[in-house]
Amino acid sequence: MNKHSVINFFEEFISIPSVSTQKERFSEVLKAADFLKNKLSSLGFKVKLIQEKNQPPLVLAEKFVGGRKTIGIYGHYDVQPEDPISEWKTPPFKLTIKNGKIYGRGVADNKGHIVQNITAIEELIKENNLKNNIIFLIEGEEESASSNFEKYTKKAKDILSKVDVFYLTDVGMIKKNIPTIYYALRGIVYFELRIWIGKNDLHSGSYGNLVLNPAQVLCEFL
């Protein structure tokens, strides 16, 4: 393994401020997707971007080597905003190695893991030792609720249906040097609730406490 080439790969990836929650950085999100597409293509993967108009694309890459099993690897190339910038001791979008540790936005969530996975596959390819088929599924809106993820995966169902097992490295560890296998994560639920009481406006001084107040109903509901 060429350490310098891995660091350069990591450094360039971290330098892209692919913040999916900020519209002004949408071009950077696209840049990160193209960066991964080019990297995986150079390793012999068949890569395509699945995208809705003005939305972060899904990077779908496949490499079939006639293996008995097909392994799917999930990741996300978008990152959280760097705010508050005053709390950073190193530049957020510049890879910094300090006291044996690597710093930068996305190092732990989730660009660092993507670099690890791609580098591992790259080494297996170089050694002619890749025994399983590989499919990368890397989205660009995990930090913004994965709004199009279900739609994208349905479009890719012909490829994804070939996967025997999926794994993701987007979680933490119990302790340093103790790998941890997660079997589930909590999800997210959001909704909009509207409450109507009656058809007409009523004077609060005359009808207060006599009829239901939507504000009170909402407070009791919550």
Q: Where would I find each of the regions flagged by the language model?
A:
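Midchain, well-structured core segments that form catalytic/ion-binding scaffolds
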Residues: 150, 158-222
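Predominant activation on well-ordered alpha-helical scaffold segments within soluble catalytic domains
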Residues: 11, 37, 115-118, 122, ...
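Beta-strand secondary-structure signal
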Residues: 11, 60, 135, 190-194
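N-terminal helical capping/dimerization or prosegment-like subdomains
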Residues: 1-85
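Short connector loops/turns at beta-strand edges and beta->alpha or beta->beta junctions
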Residues: 12-15, 93-95, 196-200
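Active-site metal-coordination/substrate-binding segment of hydrolases
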Residues: 70-138
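Acidic/histidine-rich catalytic neighborhood of metal-dependent amide-processing enzymes
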Residues: 110-184
